């Protein structure tokens, strides 16, 4: 969000929907460390649609920020955050449609005590999940590569 025209466009769209510009922070380019530190300013991450987050969702959850998403429809990429939330024990953060997305955003943002509890424990919870277990991922990926190699050898004998 380094471009002032684009920033203004985004803020105007929020203001048209009764969201004050004072409650919006648009960050520009930054170092990786600064980027991750920005998550400390966020209560809830709102997943965009129809193209949901991927790495940004993992980063938000890792930094203790719950991500509200809308159930994906026909494209793989529309299901990424839905899958991440489901596997992170955050299924209640998946809305079935736009109306539920809005109502959940209002509901979750209104319960500061619950948000604080989630933020405090989210990283601990995710560390126990397979999707955040890098050793398990590496082991499974290695196994898959060997299976592919074995099939290749058999097919090319």
Language model regions located:
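Acidic donor-binding loop of glycosyltransferase active sites
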Residues: 38-51
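Short, hinge-like loop/turn segments at secondary-structure boundaries
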Residues: 11-15, 43, 85-88
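Short alpha-helical
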Residues: 1-5, 33, 75-76
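Catalytic binding pocket for nucleotide-activated donors in carbohydrate/polymer assembly enzymes
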Residues: 21-22, 48-134
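Hydrophobic (often cysteine-bearing) scaffold residues that line and stabilize catalytic clefts
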Residues: 6, 38, 77, 137
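C-terminal amphipathic helix plus adjacent low-complexity
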Residues: 7-16, 25, 30, 103-157
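Conserved active-site histidine-acidic residue motif and adjacent donor-binding/catalytic loop
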Residues: 24-37, 52
């Amino acid at each position: 969000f380094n471009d002032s025209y684009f920033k203004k466009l985004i803020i105007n769209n929020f203001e048209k929907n009764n969201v004050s510009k004072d409650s919006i922070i648009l960050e520009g380019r930054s170092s990786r460390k600064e980027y991750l530190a920005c998550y400390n300013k966020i209560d809830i991450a709102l997943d965009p649609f129809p193209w949901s987050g991927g790495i940004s969702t993992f980063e938000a959850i890792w930094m203790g920020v719950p991500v509200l998403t809308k159930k994906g429809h026909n494209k793989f990429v529309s299901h990424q955050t839905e899958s991440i939330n489901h596997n992170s024990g955050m299924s209640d953060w998946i809305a079935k449609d736009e109306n539920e997305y809005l109502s959940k955003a209002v509901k979750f943002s209104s319960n500061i005590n619950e948000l604080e509890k989630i933020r405090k424990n989210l990283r601990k919870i995710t560390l126990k999940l397979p999707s955040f277990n890098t050793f398990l991922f590496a082991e499974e990926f290695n196994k898959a590569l060997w299976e592919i190699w074995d099939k290749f050898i058999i097919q090319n004998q």
